[in-house]
Amino acid sequence: MKKHILSLLSVLLPMVVFADAVEIDGIYYNLVPSTKEAEVTINPNVYTGDVVIPASVTCDGVDFSVTSIGSYSFFNCKSLTSISIPNSVTKIGDMAFSYCNSLSSIRISDIAAWCSIIFSGMESNPLSSGGKFYLNDEEIKDLTIPNRVTSIGQFAFTNCKSLSSVTIPDGVTSIGGNTFSYCSNLTSITIPNSVTSIGQFAFTDCNSLTSVIIPDGITIIEFGLFTRCSSLTSVTIPNSVTKIGDSAFYGCSSLTTVTLPDGVSSIGKSAFSNCSGLTSIAIPDGVSELGEMAFMYCSNLASIKIPDGVTKLGESTFHGCSSLITIVIPNGVTVLEYGVFSQCRSLTSATIGGSVKTIKKNSFTDCPALADVYCLAENVPSTDLYAFDSYILQAILHVPSNAVDAYMAQEPWRFFQCIVPLDDESIETTYYTSPTGHIDIYSIDGKLIGTAAVQSEAARIINNLPSGTSTIVKKGGKSVKIMVK
């Protein structure tokens, strides 16, 4: 389908050249007499080889400044190998350099002028081809933005593969969206405190970037700002930040710890999803909502404290947090959304707050280690039949003493192996290892009082016998005497 669309565009695009387009030295232009400006446009015969766009052209004795490159101007010019763009160009239209597969050299003479170009999209920038970027015939690797620059436009350096370091001077106040996205060899960047705005996806896929200090004055970590910066190990977030946007740190797999300032009140969808190296993060007390998939697949996150002020956990917020051991859901939460703790395979204990009224499908599925669920709600929450799975047959449910009968009467709660009052402290849970079979539990006088099936070489024995009672546990042919403390 993509090939058919590309073929169709290749046929149609030459037809959209304006009737008054003129050819001057092999380049086609749309001329605007009223402003004496010229726009580079489509060549019906396609551009090939090395193209040098001049700063001005003359037609019928009138000089025109070349200020823009029109949409699709070099679209599908597969034999275009080099492009030189003058300082006079201030705008490049949509898809201007799409499918320029052989474009290996992009040449400019002024970084400040380049920073001010308005790019309509990623493929309006010739750097999207992956070619080398030259400033006055020298390949750009260590970039220093000139002091006279106050704003770096969106897409300005996207996909600049040669870029290894960037120094931004005081005086720059904004960095546009996607400005440095896909700069795969960028290892360091210095951002001054004068910067108060950094656009969405500005550093997406900068997978060699190891550390970054976000300047004071930034209030929002925007959507996708550091998505898939897989080498990022350190990020400093200033106290001015109040919001962590959607996918802000998605896929930052080398990030081990993050300190969020106290002023943060919102953590967006997938904000830290797939941060597989993250071991700890402190959520500020002012946060009221954790977005969908906010910590999904943070596979090394062993513990996390959800503040009391949180009232909403999004779908799959902690899905796949396979190292998480315990979780306490605060009383302000009323709904456990779909898959919120699914595939938390090390989770042994979960406390559900007293205000929870609804527990949706897969909330705790594939949590095979979950041994104790503490549900503080006196009114049995409306619970999907598949909120839990078969492990609850071996798990203890702890509920308010006045609600035990109600939980026993409702699915899926009644499927728990044991439902006990929260204030019953006589419950003892003991683990014994055994390769196969099951464990038999006998009273001291030899009466069989229970069994426990062995799963994954471990069996869980539950009793609520009075303190001081002795029992005998048989594992195969061996007997072990134990006492309830």
What do the predicted segments below correspond to?
Residues 17-26:
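Boundary at the C-terminal end of the N-terminal hydrophobic targeting segment
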Residues 444-479:
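Short, surface-exposed loop/turn motifs with a glycine/proline- and acidic-biased composition
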Residues 1-3, 425, 469-485:
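C-terminal tail/sorting-segment detector
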Residues 4-15:
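Sec-dependent N-terminal signal peptides
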Residues 33-36, 46-68, 75-91, 100-117, ...:
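Structural signature of tandem-repeat unit edges
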Residues 409-425:
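A recurrent domain-boundary module in secreted/ectodomain proteins
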Residues 420-438, 443:
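Residue-level detector of functionally pivotal "anchor" positions at catalytic/ligand-binding pockets or at interdomain
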